[in-house]
Amino acid sequence: MIKKRVIPCLDVKDGRVVKGIQFQSLRDIGNPVDLALFYNEAGADELVFLDISKTEAGHDLMIEVIEATAKQLFIPLTVGGGIQSLDDITQLLNHGVDKVSLNSSALKHPELIRQASEKFGRQCICIAIDSFYDKDRKDYFYTTHGGKKLTDVRVYDWVQEVEHLGAGELLITSMHHDGMKQGFDIEHLAKIKQLVNIPIIASGGGGNAQHFVELFQHTDVSAGLAASILHDQETTVEEIKDKMREGGILVR
């Protein structure tokens, strides 16, 4: 049985870690390098670093900050945000990044997924999907540019396509749950997992340790992402893992 992962997420804007609710009302959390070191020592299984400032403007990769962050870690580091090309991916991997997360660029240029997986190995390629539930259409649709632009692409179709193109992992953020701390979108995540065979990281809604237990008891996702509850010290990685053990879930 595969051990489940708990992954802190650093949403970085202009060199600072920020957090909001449903992608809005961002507030400053701290220095990404300091937080990376903290979570590395706190028992995190991996770390996700998302440069959300690059969803609005195509500025250069935040290489210095990313490299400084990677040097603090003895756990895998995934970086996403504004990655547009194989050269961008090469640069990140050469500066200590273990996996890259593609979002809007994957939808714009789906062949980038195939090219990247063939060049670097699919284990390096994570596809991030910001999923929005449209009440009128009663379905989930893919959003781009940090959740600001709604597309007509059904999430359930897109996850299957990116797996076929060579994605090695999915990072699914349920936008209507993001920052709400009311639990993960269990039904949505379970349905996605039925459609694909690659690992899924669940994001959006984790408000306490019990929510992670429920996530892993009711879905077969591989990992749960946490941000504000860890940044605000409402719980810790170890408390989440202890609760998971009590629930009979294997942890690393």
Where on the chain are the PLM-derived regions?
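A structural motif
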Residues: 43-45, 97, 167, 220-221
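Conserved, mostly hydrophobic/aromatic
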Residues: 11, 39, 47, 79, ...
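Short, acidic/polar
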Residues: 28-40, 84-91, 151-161, 209-212
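Active-site-adjacent beta->alpha loops and helix N-cap segments on the catalytic face
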Residues: 2-6, 54-71, 84-90, 104-126, ...
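Catalytic cores of alpha/beta
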Residues: 73, 77-99, 187-224
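Hydrophobic faces of well-ordered beta-strands that scaffold small-molecule active sites
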Residues: 4-10, 19, 47-49, 77-81, ...
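N-terminal beta-alpha supersecondary unit
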Residues: 16-60
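Conserved anion-binding
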Residues: 12-14, 18, 93, 97-172, ...
